[in-house]
């Protein structure tokens, strides 16, 4: 049986018309039309050759048709799967065994099985009949038609499709493309990969031009390196200073006259306590000014009568004293009462609180 391909068929053509046209040269087994092409199966090979010779470019309904042998003839029937092969068997020995039934195109052994490609389908059928379930090198091998279509290894498929490059016309073992997808020219690959040889390091360690190029440009890990304590402290101080400036920038700059003069004074301790002037105790304050110049600027606030009776204090240092009879004098008592009755501090609390809250 020979399968013929008919191309460029007109739309008016029918299967009966095509069948009757080819039956002039031999028995037609099957006729199929698919869109603008079709297939005709002729029983005799000689009749098929006559049909090709006479009907090629034949004008049918005003259109020249193409008649030729089908190129997509199934060659899967020529590929045989041979199982249970002896591990000592070689490709040459297996090929010679199958060549007893016809020409062998390719023979590939994969582990304990193999694929054998016969040139003709009838030879493949004869090989199956003669070699299936027969002894070969001490093992009973099984021969059958291969049904695999995916070419995942050499020998799995026909010559029309290479499993490496996907092109037709050659087997995988004859493919010029290597397994990496490049043309198998090892000299060219070697020159491309290893042709540029760098000069050796003739300088000392750390003085080579290659060393400087690699490690002397930028330090991408500088931010992750451990810094000294002094550097960390300086960075923290600068950050705190900047934060204080940003925080104080939005606060009001208004201050009272008393507070401004008190802060601007460089000779007076800002935390020193001074008695403020009061009209009700002007005479007493004048009397205490001379005593305050020779004594401490702070006033003792020991209000416990027990400790006050036992303590030995200066006579006029703190605004009160003891007489010859060790009794509290009336003048000292009056001065002491007037001192604690007046308002000692008259500062603006909001301005002071805003001044110290930033720190």
UniProtKB/Swiss-Prot annotation:
Protein known as: RNA-binding protein 4
Q: Where is this region: Interaction with TNPO3?
A: 196-359
Cite the post-translational modification comment: Phosphorylated. Phosphorylated in vitro on Ser-304 by SRPK1. Phosphorylation on Ser-304 is induced upon cell stress signaling, which alters its subcellular localization and may modulate its activity on IRES-mediated mRNA translation. Phosphorylation on Ser-304 is induced upon cell muscle differentiation.
Q: Name one GO molecular function term.
A: miRNA binding
> Zn-finger regions (CCHC-type) at which positions?
160-177
Q: Which residues carry this modification: Phosphoserine?
A: 86, 304
Assembly with partners or alone:
Interacts with TNPO3; the interaction mediates nuclear import of the protein and is disrupted by nuclear Ran bound to GTP. Interacts with EIF4G1 and WT1. Interacts with EIF4A1; the interaction is modulated under stress-induced conditions. Interacts with AGO1. Interacts with AGO2; the interaction occurs under both cell proliferation and differentiation conditions and in an RNA- and phosphorylation-independent manner. Interacts with DDX5; the interaction occurs in an RNA-independent manner.
Q: What does this protein do?
A: RNA-binding factor involved in multiple aspects of cellular processes like alternative splicing of pre-mRNA and translation regulation. Modulates alternative 5'-splice site and exon selection. Acts as a muscle cell differentiation-promoting factor. Activates exon skipping of the PTB pre-mRNA during muscle cell differentiation. Antagonizes the activity of the splicing factor PTBP1 to modulate muscle cell-specific exon selection of alpha tropomyosin. Binds to intronic pyrimidine-rich sequence of the TPM1 and MAPT pre-mRNAs.
Q: Name one GO cellular component term.
A: cytoplasmic stress granule
Entries under Pfam families matching the protein: RRM_1, zf-CCHC
Disulfide pairings:
none
- According to the entry, every stretch annotated as the RRM domain falls at 2-72, 78-148
The residues joined by the cross-link Glycyl lysine isopeptide (Lys-Gly) (interchain with G-Cter in SUMO2) are 79
Gene transcribed to yield this protein: RBM4
Question: Where is this protein found?
Answer: Nucleus; Nucleus, Nucleolus; Nucleus speckle; Cytoplasm
- Taxonomically, which superkingdom? Eukaryota
């Amino acid at each position: 049986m020979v399968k013929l391909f008919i191309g460029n068929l007109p739309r008016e053509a029918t299967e009966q018309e095509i069948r009757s046209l080819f039956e002039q040269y031999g028995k037609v087994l099957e006729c199929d039309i698919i869109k603008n092409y079709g297939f005709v199966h002729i029983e005799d090979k000689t009749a098929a050759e006559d049909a090709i010779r006479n009907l090629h470019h034949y004008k049918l309904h005003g259109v020249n048709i193409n008649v030729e042998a089908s190129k997509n003839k199934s060659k899967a029937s020529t590929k045989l799967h041979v199982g249970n092969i002896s591990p000592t068997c070689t490709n040459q020995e297996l090929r010679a065994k199958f060549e007893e039934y016809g020409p062998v195109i390719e023979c590939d052994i994969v582990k304990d099985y193999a694929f054998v490609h016969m040139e003709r389908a009838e030879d493949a059928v004869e090989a199956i009949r003669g070699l299936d379930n027969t002894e070969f090198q001490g093992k009973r091998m099984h021969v059958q038609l291969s049904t695999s279509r995916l070419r995942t290894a050499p020998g799995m498929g026909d010559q029309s499709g290479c499993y490496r490059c996907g092109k037709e016309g050659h087997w995988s073992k004859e493919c010029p493309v290597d397994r990496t997808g490049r043309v198998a020219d090892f000299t060219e690959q070697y020159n491309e990969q290893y042709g540029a040889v760098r000069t050796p390091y003739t300088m000392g360690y750390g003085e080579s031009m290659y060393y400087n190029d690699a490690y002397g440009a930028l330090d991408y890990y500088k931010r992750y390196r451990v810094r000294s304590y002094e550097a960390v402290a300086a960075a923290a101080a600068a950050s705190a200073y900047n934060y204080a400036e940003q925080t104080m920038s939005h606060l009001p700059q208004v201050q009272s006259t008393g507070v401004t003069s008190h802060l601007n004074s460089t000779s007076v301790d800002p935390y020193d306590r001074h008695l403020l002037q009061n009209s009700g105790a002007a005479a007493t304050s004048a009397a205490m000014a001379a005593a305050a110049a020779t004594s401490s600027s702070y006033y003792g606030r020991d209000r416990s009568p027990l400790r006050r009776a036992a303590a030995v204090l200066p006579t006029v240092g703190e605004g009160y004293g003891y007489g010859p009879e060790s009794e509290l004098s009336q003048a000292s008592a009056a001065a002491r009462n007037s001192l604690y009755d007046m308002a000692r501090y008259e500062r603006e609390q909001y301005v002071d609180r805003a001044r110290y809250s930033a720190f």
